[in-house]
Amino acid sequence: MATQTVEGSSRSGPRRTVVGDFLKPLNSEYGKVAPGWGTTPLMGVAMALFAIFLSIILEIYNSSVLLDGISMN
């Protein structure tokens, strides 16, 4: 038998902790969706800037961008 029940065992509810009390208000908004686009445009700008950053790093790595005064072996 995979599960076993113990007769007369008392199981208390979830324990309250300081961290749990601190994080409880953050979880109270679970499942609620704000109407409209929200912060989607901001996320799009962040993704575009990150893509530009990655392309600059790739161009430097491939030496396709000339850097004056920096010698690369």
Curated annotation (Swiss-Prot):
Protein name per UniProt: Photosystem II reaction center protein H
InterPro entries named in the record: PSII_PsbH, PSII_PsbH_sf
MF GO annotations: phosphate ion binding
UniProt keywords, alphabetically: Chloroplast, Membrane, Phosphoprotein, Photosynthesis, Photosystem II, Plastid, Thylakoid, Transmembrane, Transmembrane helix
Originating species: Gossypium hirsutum (Upland cotton)
UniProt topology in membrane: Single-pass membrane protein
Oligomer and partners: PSII is composed of 1 copy each of membrane proteins PsbA, PsbB, PsbC, PsbD, PsbE, PsbF, PsbH, PsbI, PsbJ, PsbK, PsbL, PsbM, PsbT, PsbX, PsbY, PsbZ, Psb30/Ycf12, at least 3 peripheral proteins of the oxygen-evolving complex and a large number of cofactors. It forms dimeric complexes.
The UniProt record lists the keyword Plastid: yes
GO BP annotations listed: photosynthesis; protein stabilization
Post-translational modification: Phosphorylation is a light-dependent reaction catalyzed by a membrane-bound kinase; phosphorylation occurs on Thr residue(s) in the N-terminus of the protein.
Localization per Swiss-Prot or TrEMBL: Plastid, Chloroplast thylakoid membrane
Family: Belongs to the PsbH family.
GO cellular component: chloroplast thylakoid membrane; photosystem II
One matching Pfam family: PsbH
Modified residues (Phosphothreonine): T3, T5
The keyword Chloroplast appears for this protein: yes
Protein role: One of the components of the core complex of photosystem II (PSII), required for its stability and/or assembly. PSII is a light-driven water:plastoquinone oxidoreductase that uses light energy to abstract electrons from H(2)O, generating O(2) and a proton gradient subsequently used for ATP formation. It consists of a core antenna complex that captures photons, and an electron transfer chain that converts photonic excitation into a charge separation.
Entries under Gene3D superfamilies matching the protein: Photosystem II reaction center protein H
Transmembrane segments: 41-61
